[in-house]
């Protein structure tokens, strides 16, 4: 102990190589019955400079995650997983969380179109956002995972991601038409029913298939590697939704990893554990390089 009463700490290496800074804005404007409807984004960006001042080396480019926040296709609150995004940015990833229109303002595939427009924006503003456009992943949770999967499995080559992360997303709306949970899953007022225009899924199975990520998986399809994580005790979206996607990917010989979060529900719990973020990070690093 020093003479002034202080204790000395020395020799500790930095365990947080990047500071981060925050940026938000509008990536597109839609027409909504004659009024302008901005679609927003925020980005959490690594920097080796001072986030309150200089951004450091402007030539740096980072692997990037474009994130779609789940909401049951209602209006999103983009910052629900903000802590996850900051932690990932501290580890050297740009994270861009993007708004898509809710049902009532669009019908499927409007939200997928919005997401892909956001990805195009990220490509066009790569220098500003510090994005390495050759190393982009998609990630979403719940309805946002459905959007991320649909975008990943249907994107043109220029916008196709290197991989996609699915946290407890609906993947098979035809199967959903037969399932039960603690919430309405498939009627005209259900989230999926309203996404498709206020329908009963069982009465419109062709449309349900068209809106299902599993329907785009085939041996000859270009499908990016997929990480699936789903709570084994999900009270809202049956775990079997992720089983259906996993089996379709496996049978088509596509690269897939699947984790059952035993005892966990629809987000929260283990999904807020740093060990789970470590699994996601390891997958992203392996796929993005």
Where are these regions (language model features)?
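Alpha/beta-hydrolase superfamily serine-hydrolase fold, recognizing
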Residues: 1-289
